[in-house]
A protein has these predicted regions:
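An acidic, low-aromatic, low-complexity terminal/linker signal
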Residues: 1-148
Length: 148
């Protein structure tokens, strides 16, 4: 192996409680927030359902799911994510975000572990001295599926 550090492409997304870093391959599209269809008897983080390319997607607030404040809907965007499970029940889901995401190239030595601030739903890390959360997507998806 040469001396160059390994690189990966990621998407840095702003939320109410900070920023999350997702693998580029999980983000299908970023769209403008539209008022979702209401759903009954769901947790507060389950905002509603929305239509996207023939699919009915759950729209969730990752911030509320992780104990932060709700994103305001002004300037809100929606990140459409491919579900890792790839099941037919939930092939995609949607996360509320703030503003436009940023594509980033990340060298392995730029990402430093901050495990003391990690939780059930995310790993915490430093990216160029900025705290970012890396969602535990399997756990997030499992939680969403429990409420479909």
């Amino acid at each position: 192996m040469d001396n160059q550090s390994q690189q990966m492409r990621g998407v840095l997304i702003s939320l109410q409680g900070g920023k999350i870093l997702l693998p580029n391959t999980t983000v299908s599209e970023i769209i403008t927030f539209i008022t979702p269809e209401s759903v009954e008897n769901k947790p507060d983080w389950y905002i509603g359902a929305m239509r996207w390319k023939g699919y009915r997607l759950p729209l969730v607030s990752y911030s509320l799911m992780t104990g932060e404040k709700q994103e305001p809907t002004s300037n809100a965007k929606v990140a459409i994510l491919k579900a890792l499970s790839g099941g037919s029940k939930m092939p995609y889901y949607a996360l509320m975000t703030q503003g436009f995401p940023r594509l980033v190239n990340i060298a392995s030595d730029q990402l430093l572990d901050d495990s003391e601030h990690s939780s059930e739903y995310f790993y915490s890390a430093y990216l160029n001295e900025e705290i970012v959360r890396i969602p535990k997507l399997e756990r997030v998806e499992e939680t969403i599926r429990e409420h479909l």
